[in-house]
């Protein structure tokens, strides 16, 4: 039975883990790292790079290197946060055909789900390489505060990557699952998750294998990327002050600033000051310009203080919704790379009144929890019950544009709720059901998830028809809605597809594209491997001919040299079959050379044996006689 992998699909980095027996293993990628950059690049020769390979070339290819795309997933192009993000990244964020925020590289438009799918594909490949078998099922994590559109888009990404997504699980819940597995102590735990692009906080009760989420809150546009952007802004301002040149309009310079900002941020978690030195950052008529700026930890903290303070609002809301106080929290778990920043740790400690737990790896704990959940779903881990919640209230628009809630936030899922509504006008024969998610009182201020029509209502005065609307949220937090006219029993049911979102046709097209690319990638890798082995074979054959000298039969030597020439010619092309045939031909010729040398050696040795024995006797005699001669001389 194939394994279920757990994937933490992060904004900045991603991680994959698998449950093996009683242990959960974080799997290293092909570069030997336990996390993989969530980056995808498209090169000028049409190659697609994912992970570390994409990150390595980002500085020289900024417009076609896509990162932090998770922040766009499930969002509309007109969303103010998307417009803000457009100003901060060197690649193009464009309007998709469906009105969603998409990205563009090399003239092609891509849905964020598609880019996420390439990252998920890399994680799938990493797991398959380690396990030695095909992987088809996964549990994928999302920020707890993701809405339905963002969850659907993440599930779509899994499908495009060729994965059956068994469960979408909230990141803080996954962390608590990894932390709480095997613990028999009961207690209230807060998970503070500040990652690359999103912030979540969840309050959970852990007791005897039951992990129950009491509340969750967060901000899906707050994370390490924002901290980096503050440093980038500071560096650009300092350079403009010093040189009078604004680097913000230079994509190449912006990408170098981005890398330097990330590096400086990490260094300042362990040192008090760092120097950012970027030679030849730009040039003007007077010549090249260099950026050299010192950044202290204190300065960094002042630049990002408001961002850190922004995390406390959701913390207050979460403990209020969970009906606990900060000092009733027994343990605080830190998740996400940003929680390594000393100021963040200090702020969390002050808020909750206790030191956070130090026994979890903030970069890996979410993937570990996802792998555990995969094992739970497969029945490999028993005595664990996970009770999660819906992060946002769900409801419909009613008369006057009011948002009428059917399911309140922090309701345990899966759940189902029905409510009866009526018509607003006499003889109304159809109603439009508009489904929203959010906490504002007016529907228009919340996130429109989708809408549908219930037709064929029997003519009646306003207020008489009985229309039952039912909301059903599954364990992934994905919403289904139905509406039924009680008089006629006519029912209309939809699985909510975001007002934008990907259609089934879009997903199928992207799946086919991913499969085609996978075949092309496989062929490309096969060609590279064959090139390497053929070049090695040419070298070995030439070495055998040289070392064999006269022992190589002339016919074999001539055949091998012709095969070498043919192989060299095939190496200059791109045809896999031609190279394969040339390589096989050279292999046969090389074997003949080897056999010829071996047989010639055997023949020479067999023919010269008596003479050899005679020679040996002479050598021994000569030695003996020399010694005797010496003794006679003395």
From Swiss-Prot:
Keywords for this protein: ATP-binding, Chaperone, Nucleotide-binding, Phosphoprotein, Stress response
Task: Report residue spans for region: Disordered.
Answer: 601-634
The annotated regions of Low complexity compositional bias extend over 601-610
Bias kind Acidic residues: ranges: 619-634
* The keyword Chaperone is annotated on this UniProt entry: yes
| A Pfam family the protein falls into | HSP70
GO MF = ATP binding; ATP-dependent protein folding chaperone; unfolded protein binding
Modified residues annotated as Phosphothreonine in this record: 198
What the entry lists under SUPFAM superfamilies is as follows:
Actin-like ATPase domain, Heat shock protein 70kD (HSP70), peptide-binding domain
Describe how expression is induced or repressed. By stress conditions e.g. heat shock.
Q: What does this protein do?
A: Acts as a chaperone.
Q: What family does the Swiss-Prot or TrEMBL record give for this protein? A: Belongs to the heat shock protein 70 family.
What name does this protein carry? Chaperone protein DnaK
From what organism does this protein derive? Gluconobacter oxydans (strain 621H)
Q: What is the lineage of its organism?
A: Bacteria, Pseudomonadati, Pseudomonadota, Alphaproteobacteria, Acetobacterales
């Amino acid at each position: 039975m194939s394994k279920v992998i757990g994937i933490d699909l992060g904004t900045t980095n991603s991680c994959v883990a698998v449950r093996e027996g009683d242990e959960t293993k974080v799997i290293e990628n092909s570069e030997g790292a336990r996390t993989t950059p969530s980056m995808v690049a498209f090169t000028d020769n049409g190659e697609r790079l994912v992970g570390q390979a994409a990150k390595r070339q980002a500085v020289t290819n900024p417009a076609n290197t896509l990162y932090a795309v998770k922040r766009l997933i499930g969002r509309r192009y007109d969303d103010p946060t998307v417009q803000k993000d457009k100003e901060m990244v060197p690649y193009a964020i464009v309007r998709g055909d469906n009105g969603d925020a998409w990205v563009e590289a090399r003239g092609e438009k891509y849905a964020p789900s598609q880019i996420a799918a390439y990252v998920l594909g890399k994680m799938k490949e990493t797991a398959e390489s380690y396990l030695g078998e095909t992987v088809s099922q996964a549990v994928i994590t999302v920020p707890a505060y993701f809405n339905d559109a963002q969850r659907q888009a993440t599930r779509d990404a899994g499908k495009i990557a060729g994965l059956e997504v068994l469960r979408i699980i909230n990141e803080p819940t996954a962390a608590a699952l990894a932390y709480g597995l095997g613990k028999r102590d009961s207690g209230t735990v807060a998970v503070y998750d500040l990652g690359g692009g999103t912030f979540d906080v969840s309050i959970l009760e852990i007791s005897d294998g039951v992990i129950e989420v009491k509340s969750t809150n967060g901000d899906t546009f707050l994370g390490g990327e924002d901290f980096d952007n503050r440093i980038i802004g500071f560096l650009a301002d300092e350079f403009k002050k010093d040189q009078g040149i604004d680097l913000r309009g230079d994509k190449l310079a912006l990408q170098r600033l981005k890398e330097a900002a990330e590096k400086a941020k990490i260094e300042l978690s362990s040192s008090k000051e760092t120097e950012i030195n970027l030679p030849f950052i730009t040039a003007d008529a007077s010549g090249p310009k260099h950026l050299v700026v010192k950044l202290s930890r204190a300065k960094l903290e002042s630049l990002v203080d408001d961002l850190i303070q922004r995390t406390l609002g959701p913390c207050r809301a979460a403990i209020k919704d969970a009906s606990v106080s900060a000092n009733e929290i027994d343990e605080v778990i830190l998740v996400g790379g940003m929680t390594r920043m000393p100021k963040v740790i200090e702020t969390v400690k002050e808020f909750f009144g206790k030191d956070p737990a130090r026994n979890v790896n903030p970069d890996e704990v979410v993937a570990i929890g996802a792998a555990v959940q995969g094992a739970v779903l497969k029945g490999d881990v028993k005595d664990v019950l996970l009770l999660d919640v819906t992060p946002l209230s769900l409801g419909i628009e009613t008369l006057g544009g009011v948002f009428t809630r059917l399911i309140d936030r922090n309701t345990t899922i899966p759940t189902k709720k029905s409510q009866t509504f009526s018509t607003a006008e006499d003889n109304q024969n159809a109603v439009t059901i508009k489904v929203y998610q959010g906490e504002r009182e007016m529907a228009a201020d919340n996130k429109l998830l989708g809408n549908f029509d219930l037709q064929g209502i029997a003519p009646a005065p306003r207020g008489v028809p009985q229309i039952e609307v039912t909301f059903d949220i599954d364990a992934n937090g994905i919403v289904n809605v139905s509406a039924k006219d009680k008089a006629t029993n006519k029912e209309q049911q939809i699985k909510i597809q975001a007002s934008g979102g990907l259609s089934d046709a879009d997903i199928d097209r992207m799946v086919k594209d991913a499969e085609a690319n996978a075949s092309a990638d496989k062929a490309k890798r096969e060609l590279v491997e064959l090139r390497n082995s053929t070049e090695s074979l040419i070298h070995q054959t030439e070495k055998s001919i040289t070392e064999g000298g006269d022992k190589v039969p002339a016919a074999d030597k001539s055949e091998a040299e012709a095969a070498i020439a043919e192989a060299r010619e095939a190496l200059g092309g791109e045809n896999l079959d031609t190279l394969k045939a040339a390589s096989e031909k050279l292999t046969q010729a090389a074997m003949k050379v080897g056999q010829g040398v071996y047989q010639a050696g055997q023949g020479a040795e067999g023919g010269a044996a008596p003479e050899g024995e005679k020679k040996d006797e002479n050598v021994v005699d000569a030695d003996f006689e020399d010694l005797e001669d010496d003794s006679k001389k003395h």
